[in-house]
Regions:
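C-terminal catalytic/substrate-binding lobe primarily of soluble NAD(P)-dependent oxidoreductases
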Residues: 2-8, 202-449
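A short hydrophobic/small-residue beta-strand
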Residues: 123-125
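Rossmann-fold NAD(P)-binding glycine/threonine-rich loop
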Residues: 104, 109-120, 129-149, 153-156
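Short gly/pro/ser/thr-enriched loop/turn and capping motifs at secondary-structure boundaries
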Residues: 52-53, 131-140, 157-161, 182-186, ...
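N-terminal glycine-/serine-/threonine-rich beta1-alpha1-beta2 phosphate-ribose binding loop
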Residues: 1-116
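Short, ordered loop/turn segments at secondary-structure junctions
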Residues: 49-51, 105-106, 129-132, 155-156, ...
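Rossmann-like NAD(P)H-binding beta-loop-alpha module
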Residues: 143-144, 151-221
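Short acidic, glycine/serine/threonine-rich loops at helix termini
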Residues: 58-59, 136-139, 162-165, 180, ...
């Protein structure tokens, strides 16, 4: 990689890569902490509905007050300072900004911002994987047609997994499985923002509950975030979901090749070429030692006896047969390494993972028995969790995407564990996110095309 030298060239030329950030939550704040220190990068503006929170987060990230005191976008461009605003569209329309980072985490907002960014001829880094799971394949197609880059966010696990897959294939290996680790027990699918504290207090040292958004955090616990992220990976790499989605097998870092291989070879997978998320908890509640809860991995196959001998000779974490090996990254640095995506988009016009087809979906699935006329509360809430589902199944059965299961009313009773359908809810067909999703379903009516 030579991104650093390319950034230095832009710095020396007085033409830093110009960035607009929409959404200053945890991911955005982590990006800001490193962006200020990156030569050749200029965050021209930051947009957040809560301007005072945005200013507070900039200060938290180590920015001196004078650095984000620009009175306008024009002033920020000229003074190499940063403008803070509540108007995201102003960033998108600003002719001097090259790259938009969408980090709101709200599917509807992300889709709208992506469409407008593409329309204005700018690259977009989609931190908002929730929006990508709803309509990413169509947004990426529109971006390619417009000659701009739509990309997943480096530092988040999906983009890192895509890099693992690309590395393996570029080296001539067959990819058996790829994914990440998490903390999982089967009953977590029923967790909600009230009882998630039982899990968080047990495993995290939380001294200030006010610093935690329980609904957001619960989306990681109940399996939704895993389904969303593995859907992003499938749609970007050509890997596919298993028929029933993720099974979360327990595994240490050193057992990845043994566990994440096909059942026909003694593993847990339905077939090869799939995504899977390993658990850091055994089914009896014991912690898995040397787990991969914050990391990512890929399992590859040695297709020759010589390659398999090399797996063993160089301790490449092979399975017992020696046929499969694993590579893993123990951590992901979230927004701290997001600058890789920004630089890659602006300087090499290259995505760090981008959808190439509609292979996987995330179906809204009932956490409990739901009653007609209940209002669904979306990701991490009390009503539904997101189950990874093959796109062809979702299309054929009309599943309701998890990202749009927010503030819609049920038309019928739904049993716990049942995947919801479009026909089960009252929705506004003119809503932009709904319209774009429906457009994508029509465009990809034949899966993987």
């Amino acid at each position: 990689m030579n991104l650093h030298s390319l950034l230095l060239e832009r710095e020396v030329a007085g033409r830093p890569v110009t960035v607009g950030l929409i959404g200053v939550g945890k991911f955005g704040t982590m990006f800001l902490s490193q962006a200020r220190l990156t030569k050749g990068l200029h965050v021209v503006a930051v947009a957040d509905l809560n301007v005072e929170r945005a200013r507070s987060q900039l200060a938290t990230a180590g920015w001196p007050n004078e650095q984000f005191a620009a009175a306008s976008l024009d002033n920020a461009m000229k003074a190499r300072a940063t403008y803070v605003t509540a108007d995201a569209e102003a960033l998108i329309q600003c002719p001097g900004i090259e790259v938009i980072v969408e980090a709101t985490g709200i599917p509807e907002a992300g889709i709208v911002h992506a469409l407008k960014t593409i329309e204005h001829g700018k690259h977009i880094v989609m931190v908002n994987v929730e929006a990508d799971a709803v309509a990413g394949p169509l947004l990426a197609r529109k971006a390619r047609a417009a000659g701009v880059v739509y990309r997943l966010a480096w530092g988040d696990q999906p983009a890192l997994i895509c890099e693992h897959v690309d590395w393996a294939r570029a080296a001539g290996f067959k990819v058996i499985a790829a994914g990440k680790g998490t903390r999982y027990e089967p009953h977590y699918h029923r967790s909600n923002p009230d009882n998630v504290w039982d899990i968080l207090d047990k495993y995290l040292n939380i001294t200030d509950r006010n610093s935690i958004n329980p609904k957001m955090f619960n989306s990681f616990v109940d399996g939704t975030k895993s389904g969303i992220e593995m859907t992003a990976v499938c749609n970007a790499t050509g890997l596919v979901p298993q028929t029933e989605g993720l099974s979360f097998p327990p595994a240490t870092r050193f057992e990845l090749a043994e566990v994440c291989k096909p059942k026909s070879a003694g593993g847990t997978l339905e077939k090869d070429g799939v995504t899977e998320v390993t658990s850091s908890v055994y089914r009896d509640g014991r912690d898995v030692p040397h787990h991969l809860a914050l990391g990512t991995y890929v399992v590859i196959e040695g297709e020759t006896e010589y390659a398999r001998r090399c797996f063993s000779e160089y301790a490449m974490l092979p399975d017992r047969s020696g046929r499969y090996a694993a590579l893993y990254r123990p951590i992901h640095m979230i927004g701290l390494e997001l600058g890789i995506s920004v630089a890659s988009a602006a300087l090499r016009k290259e995505p760090t993972g981008a959808p190439t087809g509609f292979r996987s979906d995330v179906a809204a699935t009932a956490k409990r028995d739901l009653k007609a006329r209940e209002i669904l509360d979306g990701e991490g809430g009390f009503c539904v969790w997101g189950k990874q589902t093959p796109a062809e199944v979702s299309l054929a059965q009309g599943h309701l995407p998890l990202g749009l299961a927010q503030n819609v009313k049920l038309k019928r009773d739904v049993r716990e564990g049942e995947r919801l359908k479009w026909s089960d809810v009252e929705y506004d067909p003119n809503d932009t996110a709904v319209r774009v999703r429906r457009e994508m379903e029509a465009a990809f009516a034949r899966p993987n095309v």
